[in-house]
Amino acid sequence: MAFRRTLFALLSISSLTTAHSLLHSSNKRDIAVNDAMITIMTNVIQTISPATSTCDNAPHPEECSTAQHAAPFILQSFNDYDLATVGEIAAVTSLMLFESGEFKYNKNYFSPSGGPNPGQGTRNMQQANFNSLYAAYLVSQGKLSQEALSAATSPDAVLALVRPDEFTFGSAAWFLATQ
């Protein structure tokens, strides 16, 4: 059963990346994320991880995201960081699903010392130093203000800047593309 789910997901990702690549080949850098792409991505995520269909019983409901909610942000990150191959898309998606406990977490609660690891989070559970680099990148792109970053004087404050949906679901693609 798991093999069939994985095969279906990879075929769906392949369809998604084919459409994405065709749009990229027309020299359009910014591809409009459309309903069909969102539906495919939602189905891919739910096939890989059925638990993403709901946030019922999530340990931290305020952090939980369903596949349907996450899909447009994830697709936009593929566009923003020029990810277009099946391997890139599968790697980034699976990493986020694994690291965030199937989108149930957006911040670290489980470090080797037993408590949270300050500043660690986003959907790929980046360490605090990478969240600082990511926040600086977002400032350079005009997506965050320098004032907000300068005011973030602790690792958890920087994490708070990069945890909104439009940034948290882009952190893994940013990491792959830049680090």
Residue ranges of predicted features:
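Fungal secretory targeting signals
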Residues: 1-30
